[in-house]
Amino acid sequence: MNILKEEIHSSMQGLCDNVLELENVRFAGMISNFGNLYVGGFKDGITPYENDEARRSMYMKFALESNFRKDFDDSFGAFKYSTIQREKVSILTINICNYLLLVFVEPGVDLHALADRIQSIIDENESHDHNKQNLD
């Protein structure tokens, strides 16, 4: 891995780690446009509801849905985030550059407040990365 890729990977993993520290978060991961899990995973002690193969399929479906949403960017503006509420888990997807931050939380969590909190974490990380670049 070259230095730039290592820094991006480290920054994305740091973001996922910070999100996993939030209360009621089960999973935080960065998904590529092709549906591959780039970084992230489940919080320690959490048992996934689905097996590895089902999760890979799910990641791909989230990536495809995100790519289809781009068709409407000219009409509605850029996609920011979406929420899904299910019986066993709620899901938040946030578009970050060419990746999708996928977050699973326990049901009943205010997903809009969570999206705002995660956006502030993203902003803090970007500010930290920018300041680090200025020092280099």
Predicted segments with their positions:
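Non-catalytic interaction/Regulatory regions outside core domains
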Residues: M1-D136
